[in-house]
């Protein structure tokens, strides 16, 4: 799973105890939170010992009574004991993101800004391959020196 930062929120799916949930990737959240209206009624929960800071005033805060099995967006095995409260969407916090091997990268550009603009205008999408189905090569072709001293690649 990969998501480029844009005006769209980074949302991904996870399967907890066999049930699929969609949630916002939130690197600022220490723990994962499931929306109260999405928490299955037959899953045990208890009043949380600690409150949640940073999402305003949540009056009802619960926590799963059990540590739950979870599969990440690319089937990464993990466990979670989520908090549960009235929020509009689920949040995947660092407790899960670390187990999923999540990374935040800001790669240095391989090409000049001018060439990037030209490629973008031609329909290139960063991270996708070239070609009609976006399945072509994704990295630049490296020039190799021909050590046989003949043909293409021979240094003059």
UniProtKB/Swiss-Prot annotation:
Pfam family of the protein (one): RVP
E.C. number(s) listed in UniProt: 3.4.23.50
Gene3D superfamilies found in the cross-reference section: Acid Proteases
Coiled-coil positions: none
Phenotype upon changing residue 26 to M: Loss of activity
Keywords attached to this entry: Aspartyl protease, Autocatalytic cleavage, ERV, Hydrolase, Protease, Transposable element
Role summary: Retroviral proteases have roles in processing of the primary translation products and the maturation of the viral particle. Endogenous Pro proteins may have kept, lost or modified their original function during evolution. This endogenous protein has retained most of the characteristics of retroviral proteases.
Protein name: Endogenous retrovirus group K member 10 Pro protein
Provenance organism: Homo sapiens (Human)
